[in-house]
């Protein structure tokens, strides 16, 4: 249960902290774009011209516009600002950043 969050939380937190523009694909195929303002166990607050509350169960993929370092394995001052989250069926993908960058 907590194992899934050990990847999701640092990834979303790095995107939020570095204000990386993201594309969020929903399970119905809709693409949302903006910056992650905040998140919790169930929702992501996405800011563009307006703020949108996006439920995580509706998200298929989160694609950053540029690579982001979300692991503190190389100890470059990894922060421990973990949110308390339960498990989610979200399918985040950090390796698709070159999908639409042409």
Swiss-Prot record:
GO terms for biological process: regulation of DNA-templated transcription; regulation of RNA stability; regulation of translation, ncRNA-mediated. Pfam families: Hfq. Keywords: RNA-binding, Stress response. Residues 63-102 are annotated as: Disordered. This is RNA-binding protein Hfq. Signal peptide: none annotated. Homohexamer. The gene is hfq. Residues 9-68 form the Sm domain. The keyword Methyltransferase does not apply. RNA chaperone that binds small regulatory RNA (sRNAs) and mRNAs to facilitate mRNA translational regulation in response to envelope stress, environmental stress and changes in metabolite concentrations. Also binds with high specificity to tRNAs. GO terms for molecular function: RNA binding.
